[in-house]
Each structure stands twice: as C-alpha cells, then as structure tokens.
Amino acid sequence: MARVKRGVVAHRRHKKILARAKGYYGARSRVYRVAFQAVIKAGQYAYRDRRQKKRQFRALWIARINAGARQNGLSYSRMIDGLKKAQVIIDRRVLADIAMHDAVAFAALAEKAKGALAA
C-alpha cells in the first residue's frame, strides 16, 4: 500500500480556518493554532448570542412600550393588561414601533387600554 502524506489535506484545513479568522487581530488571523481557538470561540459566541438576541430585543421593546405607556399615565404591565382585556391583539414588536414612530396612535391604544381597565 502506498504511503499517504497528509500535507495537502493539512494545508487545506489550515487555509479554511485562517480564512474564517480573516480580520481578527494579531496572531489570531495568522497563526493556525491561535486562529483555530479564536474561530471555535467565535462560533460559541455566535451560537449563544443568536439566542440572547431574542431576549435583548424583547427587553428593548418592553422598555419602549413602558416609556410610551408612562407618557400616557399607565405602567407597562397595566397597558398590556388593558390591551388584553380590550381584546387588542398586537405584539410587543409592533407596539414598540408604534410607540416610537406614531405617538397619536399609541395614545389611542393607551386610552383603549384605560377604558378596558376601568370597565
């Protein structure tokens, strides 16, 4: 059986990792051993942060809704409760967008929530 030298395979593997580490600082983009660790860690961060992104955006939406609700004399939780009781089906992403860009429409929603809470 012929001897298999793995130089070509190793070179390809190293090239692939170094390509993924392109743009990293210092040895992280030049030295295979360090680049490999950096790429693995980057993958772990990416995996973790894809999940965290969902939480962070929801927290941002809630903060924006809360700010808008307080300008209209409600707290966030009372606003959401009032909208649910008024059977207004609108998600937090859209509600936050309305709070940011259309104060008049948000005030109308707040009044609707207040009405449902009073009833």
UniProtKB/Swiss-Prot annotation:
SUPFAM superfamilies: Ribosomal protein L20 (SSF74731). InterPro entries: Ribosomal_bL20 (IPR005813), RIBOSOMAL_L20_CS (IPR049946), Ribosomal_protein_bL20_C (IPR035566). One of its GO terms (cellular component) is ribosome. Keywords: Ribonucleoprotein, Ribosomal protein, RNA-binding, rRNA-binding. The keyword Glycoprotein does not apply. PANTHER family: 39S RIBOSOMAL PROTEIN L20. Binds directly to 23S ribosomal RNA and is necessary for the in vitro assembly process of the 50S ribosomal subunit. It is not involved in the protein synthesizing functions of that subunit. HAMAP family: Ribosomal_bL20. This is Large ribosomal subunit protein bL20.
